[in-house]
C-alpha cells in the first residue's frame, strides 16, 4: 500500500524572511563567503565588522529526497557589496543536472546569474512578484542588487542535490555583477574564470552516467 505524505501549508513572513513549519534551515555568515568576491582586500577590511553577520539564510520544507517529490523554501539575503561587487550566494548546479528550479521574488531587487557548462552567461531579474525559471543544466547564483533585503521562494525536484564545487574549480563564475555607479548594475568578466574541458562538461550534463547505463 502506498504511504501518502500529509499536505502542508507554510506561511512566509516577508519582514523576517522566515517560513513557518520548515523542516530545516541553514545560514551563511560573511566569513563563510571568503573567496567568492574579486576584491579580496575589501573583503578582509569588512571582516572586522561583518565577520559574524548572517548574509543569507535559507528555510526549507523537505518531505524526502525521492524522485517525484518537491523541496521548497525561502531565501532571505541582506543588501551589500564587497568593493563594487554585490552580495551573492555561493551558487550551484544540481547533482542531477537535468533538474530545473523555480524562484519567485517576494521582496527586494535581485538577479539570477546563470552559466552553462560551456560558459554561456545569462542574467534574469528576480524582483518582487517575478518568477525566474532556471532550466536543467544551468549553474546559478542569486545576487542582491537592491538596498533592501532580497526574499525569494524556491522550488525544485527533491532528488536534485547540489554541486557547489563546479564553480570553485572553474575559478568562479564567468561573470560578476557590480555597481555601475549610476544606481544600477553591470556585468563584467571574471578574469580568473577557466573554461571547462570536454570531460568536465560531459560530466556536468550527466553524459557519463547515461553512457555507462547505455
From Swiss-Prot:
Any one Gene Ontology molecular-function term assigned to this protein's record: glucose-6-phosphate isomerase activity
Subcellular location as annotated = Cytoplasm
Q: Which residues bind Fe cation?
A: 92, 94, 101, 140
Q: Name one Pfam family in it.
A: GPI
Organism domain of life: Bacteria
Q: Which E.C. number(s) belong to this protein? A: 5.3.1.9
Per the record, the similarity remark reads: Belongs to the archaeal-type GPI family.
Biological processes per GO annotation: gluconeogenesis; glycolytic process
Q: What class of enzyme is it?
A: isomerase
| Gene Ontology CC annotations of this record | cytoplasm
Keyword Hydrolase assigned? no
Q: Which UniProt keywords apply?
A: Cytoplasm, Gluconeogenesis, Glycolysis, Iron, Isomerase, Metal-binding
The UniProt note on the cofactor reads as follows:
Binds 1 Fe cation per subunit.
Identify the metabolic or biological route this protein is part of.
Carbohydrate degradation; glycolysis; D-glyceraldehyde 3-phosphate and glycerone phosphate from D-glucose: step 2/4
The protein's required cofactor(s) are namely: Fe cation
- Any additional notes? R.meliloti has a classic glucose-6-phosphate isomerase (AC Q92SC4) and two archaeal-type glucose-6-phosphate isomerases.
Keyword Iron listed = yes
Q: State what protein this is by name.
A: Putative glucose-6-phosphate isomerase 1
The reaction(s) annotated as catalysed by this protein in its Swiss-Prot or TrEMBL entry are:
alpha-D-glucose 6-phosphate = beta-D-fructose 6-phosphate
Amino acid at each position: 500500500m502506498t504511504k501518502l505524505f500529509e499536505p502542508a501549508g507554510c506561511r512566509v513572513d516577508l519582514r523576517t524572511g522566515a517560513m513557518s513549519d520548515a523542516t530545516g534551515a541553514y545560514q551563511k555568515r560573511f566569513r563563510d563567503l571568503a573567496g567568492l568576491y574579486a576584491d579580496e582586500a575589501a573583503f578582509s577590511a569588512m571582516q572586522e565588522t561583518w565577520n559574524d553577520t548572517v548574509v543569507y539564510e535559507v528555510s526549507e520544507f523537505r518531505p524526502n529526497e525521492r524522485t517525484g517529490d518537491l523541496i521548497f523554501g525561502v531565501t532571505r539575503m541582506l543588501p551589500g557589496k564587497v568593493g563594487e561587487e554585490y552580495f551573492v550566494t555561493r551558487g550551484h548546479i544540481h547533482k542531477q543536472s537535468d533538474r530545473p528550479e523555480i524562484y519567485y521574488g517576494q521582496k527586494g531587487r535581485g538577479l539570477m546569474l546563470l552559466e552553462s557548462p560551456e560558459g554561456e552567461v545569462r542574467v534574469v531579474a528576480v524582483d518582487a512578484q517575478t518568477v525566474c525559471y532556471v532550466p536543467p543544466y544551468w549553474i546559478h547564483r542569486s545576487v542582491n542588487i537592491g538596498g533592501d533585503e532580497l526574499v525569494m521562494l524556491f522550488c525544485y525536484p527533491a532528488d536534485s542535490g547540489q554541486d557547489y564545487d563546479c564553480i570553485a574549480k572553474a575559478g568562479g563564475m564567468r561573470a560578476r555583477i557590480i555597481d555601475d555607479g549610476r544606481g544600477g548594475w553591470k556585468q563584467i568578466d571574471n578574469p580568473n574564470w577557466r573554461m571547462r574541458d570536454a570531460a568536465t562538461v560531459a560530466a556536468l550534463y550527466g553524459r557519463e552516467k547515461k553512457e555507462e547505463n547505455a
